[in-house]
């Protein structure tokens, strides 16, 4: 499928109608879903109605924005009024939100056409989209492999051309890791840049909504639309949003790029290292001043995250008890058995595991030893990044230690699965913007991602570095053969 700009030109020159573009996307979804399973719900009727509205605006001679008539997928942990929002969990299988999330509201106002709700790991807890209670999404480059997670459906849908762009959420790498494994661009904005109102919470101090696209430009256009202050989100930042399109300059002269030393070494696949090193050399050829930078506490990100995130999850998920909404167990003996049976039957294994870890870390005897200590280490990780950004504009490293693994390969070994987010987690702990973009393939033709990290609210720096690299290579033009 063409880029946002190309489709916009087709629309305003009447070469194609929004209805035709939407029908083409729905046809691709119809053909690929039996083997790909990117979507939990396909909203065809609503999509066609939105497309006709855009066509009516054009027929009336009205100007339309860049996203008008563009097919988009929405991760199924964002509330969509009147449309089921399941979070990939049995406990929310029949939940129909009575309100719209800020992000989906903004996209609808911009004329974007939602073609469906995408699959995810249950409550966004996972790195492979195998934890969904409903289906396992395949990787478009090899459907026997995982697309990454937790926003695997959103990444796979864009890679497979089922939609032009999509929306995901990122708590510890849930946008960037699937973007890397599916060979697309995924951006996690600065914490607070995009409203979380209507996003079903996993870990509130880490969650952030962001865009997926086939190109850096498409991701920038989508970010432009969803970023901005929202009084309904108390963590939303009251800042002026720059014009991100002005950052799309294919030149890195004078830019300082730091390579995080700690991300290379044990656990990193040889081919991934080779491809990423080659991409870093390319940045130098584009005029960037490349230097090694040490972030000594980077390696503590994973254990720190697996105390903080489950602790917040155990509190956030306490609300699912069968009383007000969602699944409720049949014929409980009393109130207590209604609570326990609803949660035992409604939550999947990984969600239960994280609730247990979090409850343990927050318990009176262990609070100081675990939760409080993790928060102190989080501050130290943040300080490492602050020090690094005193001497560089952008940091780079691999997005993931390996390429996409086989479905079922790591489900019995949670620790091995958790290591998939080794490179992405510290960025969330520090609240920084991070982007993954394709930088090559391994010997089996599986995509490899390069991660670029910026300072707080310096999405412009990240987008410029990513755009310059992308424009000097052909990786973004590759498509899976489905």
Curated annotation (Swiss-Prot):
A cellular-component GO term for this protein: glutamyl-tRNA(Gln) amidotransferase complex
PROSITE patterns: AMIDASES
Catalytic activity: L-glutamyl-tRNA(Gln) + L-glutamine + ATP + H2O = L-glutaminyl-tRNA(Gln) + L-glutamate + ADP + phosphate + H(+)
Pfam families, per database record: Amidase
An individual GO BP term: translation
Residues annotated as catalytic: 75, 150, 174
EC number: 6.3.5.7
GO molecular function terms listed in the Swiss-Prot or TrEMBL record: ATP binding; glutaminyl-tRNA synthase (glutamine-hydrolyzing) activity
Residue pairs linked by disulfide bridges in the UniProt entry: none
Keywords: ATP-binding, Ligase, Nucleotide-binding, Protein biosynthesis
Family per similarity comment: Belongs to the amidase family. GatA subfamily.
Function: Allows the formation of correctly charged Gln-tRNA(Gln) through the transamidation of misacylated Glu-tRNA(Gln) in organisms which lack glutaminyl-tRNA synthetase. The reaction takes place in the presence of glutamine and ATP through an activated gamma-phospho-Glu-tRNA(Gln).
Assembly and oligomerization: Heterotrimer of A, B and C subunits.
Protein name stated in the entry: Glutamyl-tRNA(Gln) amidotransferase subunit A
């Amino acid at each position: 499928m063409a880029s946002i700009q190309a489709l916009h030109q087709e629309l305003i020159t009447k070469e194609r109608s929004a209805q035709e573009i939407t029908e083409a996307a729905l046809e691709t979804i119809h053909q690929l879903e039996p083997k790909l399973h990117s979507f939990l719900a396909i909203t065809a009727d609503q999509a066609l109605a939105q497309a006709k509205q855009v066509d009516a605006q054009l027929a009336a001679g009205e100007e339309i924005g860049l996203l008008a008539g563009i097919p988009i997928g929405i991760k199924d942990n964002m509330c969509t009024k009147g449309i089921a929002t399941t979070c990939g969990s049995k406990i929310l299988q029949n939940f129909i939100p009575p309100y719209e999330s800020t992000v989906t509201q903004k996209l609808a106002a911009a004329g974007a056409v939602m073609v469906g709700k995408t699959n995810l790991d249950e409550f966004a807890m996972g790195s492979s989209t195998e934890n969904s209670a409903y289906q396992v999404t395949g990787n478009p480059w090899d459907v026997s492999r995982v697309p990454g997670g937790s926003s695997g459906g959103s990444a796979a849908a864009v890679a497979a051309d089922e939609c032009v762009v999509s929306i995901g959420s990122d708590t510890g790498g849930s946008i960037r890791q699937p973007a890397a494994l599916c060979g697309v661009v995924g951006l996690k904005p600065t914490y607070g840049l995009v409203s979380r109102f209507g996003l079903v919470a996993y870990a509130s101090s880490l969650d952030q909504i962001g865009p997926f696209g086939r190109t850096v430009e498409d991701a920038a256009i989508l970010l432009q639309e969803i970023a901005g202050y929202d009084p309904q989100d108390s963590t939303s930042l009251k800042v002026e949003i720059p014009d991100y399109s002005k950052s799309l300059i294919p030149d890195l002269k004078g830019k300082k790029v730091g390579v995080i030393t700690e991300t290379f070494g044990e656990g990193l696949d040889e081919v991934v290292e080779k491809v990423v090193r080659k991409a870093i050399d390319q940045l130098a050829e584009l005029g960037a001043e490349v230097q090694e930078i040490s972030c000594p506490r980077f390696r503590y990100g994973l254990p720190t995250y697996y105390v903080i995130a489950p602790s917040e999850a155990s509190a956030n998920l306490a609300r699912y008890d069968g009383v007000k909404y969602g699944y409720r167990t049949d014929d409980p003996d009393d109130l207590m058995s209604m609570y326990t049976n609803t949660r035992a039957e409604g939550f999947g294994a990984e969600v239960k595991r994280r609730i247990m870890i979090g409850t343990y870390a927050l318990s009176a005897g262990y609070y100081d030893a675990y939760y409080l200590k993790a928060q102190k280490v989080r501050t130290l990780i943040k300080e490492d990044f602050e020090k690094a950004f005193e001497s560089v504009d952008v940091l780079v490293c691999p997005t993931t230690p390996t390429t996409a693994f086989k479905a079922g390969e790591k489900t019995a070994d949670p620790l091995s699965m958790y290591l998939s987010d080794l490179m992405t987690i510290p960025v969330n702990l520090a609240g920084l913007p991070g982007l993954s973009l394709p930088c090559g393939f391994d010997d089996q033709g599986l995509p490899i991602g390069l991660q670029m990290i910026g300072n707080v609210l310096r999405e412009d720096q990240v987008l410029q570095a990513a755009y310059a690299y992308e424009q000097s290579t052909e990786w973004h033009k590759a498509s899976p053969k489905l």
